[in-house]
UniProtKB/Swiss-Prot annotation:
The keyword Membrane applies. One of its GO terms (molecular function) is sugar transmembrane transporter activity. Pfam families: MtN3_slv. The gene is SWEET5. The lineage of its organism: Eukaryota, Viridiplantae, Streptophyta, Embryophyta, Tracheophyta. This is Bidirectional sugar transporter SWEET5. It comes from Arabidopsis thaliana (Mouse-ear cress).
Length: 240
């Protein structure tokens, strides 16, 4: 019989694979931006936001904050690198006002993380205290980011069309949440459990909406418009 530690490691590896797939979801958008040499109507906001989310989760997984969380570090460290690449691509091909917006946002995020790290290491002296503070912050940021799928779901209901909500990405979001919920339960971690429990709920609602409105969808509309709407909603997120 597999012991809980081994089972947790296996589940965490599966979670890493699914989350990596979600982090890869924006690649077609980035390729299109690169070919056009312009960001067009695509927005950098979801990628800039995910940078902070990944930084926070990577810090959370460090042994002096939450011990035995290596798999949280690996996927969010990887995600952080990928999101920084995406943001860089936006910066290179964006207009001056958008570049200024990206620069200001990134500076604010770096300063915020520096303050969080300093306060955590200087004022909190146990992993229990540190994991509580960072864990709560991670939950808050994740809940805020779940507002993006709500925007897409509202659009689907309004238009009675699922072309703005790809099925496999919705399914992957659901599976990602479920896997990390299992991971959090094998060695109880409320800070991973809560946001991914909400992610699972969001995923299942997306799937129900997809099934409900699939038959009423007009698939002949402009695919490029669909991609812009979906990318700008910032739903392509993967996290622990």
């Amino acid at each position: 019989m597999t012991d809980p530690h081994t089972a947790r490691t296996i589940v965490g590896i599966v979670g890493n694979v699914i989350s990596f797939g979600l982090f890869c979801a924006p690649i077609p958008t980035m390729v299109k931006i690169w070919k056009m040499k312009s960001v067009s109507e695509f927005k950098p906001d979801p990628y800039v936001a995910t940078v902070l989310n990944c930084m926070m989760w990577t810090f959370y997984g460090l042994p002096f904050v939450q011990p035995d969380s290596l798999l949280v570090i690996t996927i969010n460290g990887t995600g952080l690198f990928m999101e920084l690449v995406y943001v860089t691509i936006f910066f290179v091909f964006a207009t001056s006002p958008v570049r200024r917006k990206i620069t200001i946002a990134m500076v604010i995020e770096v300063i915020f993380m520096a303050v969080v790290i300093f306060c955590t290491m200087y004022f909190l002296h146990t992993t229990k205290q540190r994991s509580m503070l960072i864990g709560i912050l991670c939950i808050v940021f994740n809940v805020i980011m779940y507002a993006a799928p709500l925007t897409v779901m509202k659009l689907v209901i309004k238009t009675k069309s699922v072309k703005y909500m790809p099925f496999f990405l919705s399914l992957a979001n659901f599976m990602n949440g479920v896997v990390w919920v299992i991971y959090a339960c094998l060695k109880f971690d409320p800070y991973i459990l809560i946001p991914n429990g909400l992610g699972s709920l969001s995923g299942i609602i997306q799937l129900i909406i997809y099934i409900t409105y699939y038959k009423t969808t007009n698939w002949n509309d402009d695919d490029e418009d669909k991609e812009k709407r979906y990318s700008n909603a910032g739903i392509e997120l993967g996290q622990a």
